[in-house]
C-alpha cells in the first residue's frame, strides 16, 4: 500500500507487484493466517481493477482468484468458492501455452477445486478428475527438468497439495 500511495506501482510493473502480493498471500494462507492473506489477495484484485485489468483474461489475477477460493474452502463457503475456482480455471483453460509457474498455479487451482468437489455428494468423481488433472500438470511442469520438481519463480508451496491422493 505504501508503494501504491507513493505512486510507485505503474502499469508496467503491476503484474510483478500483484504476483508478489499473491506470494505473500499464499505464505500467510500456508501459515493459517486467512484474514491477513485474504486482505492481501483482495488488495491485489483492487490493483487489477484500478489498472483496468480484466481479471477474466489475466493469468496473475486468475492465480489470485484461485487462492481466494482456497480461503473460502477453509471457511466452508462452497458456493462462492466454486465460483472463484471456476473463474480462475476458465482463464487457465483458455491459455494455449504456459510457463512452468503458470502450470504450477493451474495445478494448484485444479487441486483446490478437486478438494471442494470431493466434499459434495455426487461430485466426487469430478473431484477425482480435477485431482488427476492437477497431478498431470505437475508432471508436465517437470518435463525436461533436471529434477522432479523444478523451482519456479513463484512461491513454492508443495505442502498445500494432497500428495497422498490415491487414483
What residue ranges belong to the model's regions?
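TPR-repeat structural position
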Residues: 34, 78, 123-124
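Residue at a conserved register position within TPR or TPR-like alpha-solenoid repeats
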Residues: 28, 65, 72, 110, ...
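"A position-specific structural signal for the A-helix of alpha-solenoid helical repeats
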Residues: 16, 22-23, 60, 66-67, ...
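Structural motif corresponding to the intra-repeat A-B loop/turn of tetratricopeptide repeats
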Residues: 31, 68, 75, 120-121
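Terminal, low-structured helical/coil segments at or just beyond the last alpha-helical repeat
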Residues: 112, 119-167
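Amphipathic alpha-helical segments of tetratricopeptide repeats
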Residues: 1-8, 42-53, 86-97, 135-139
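Residue register of alpha-helical TPR repeats
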Residues: 12, 19, 60-63, 83, ...
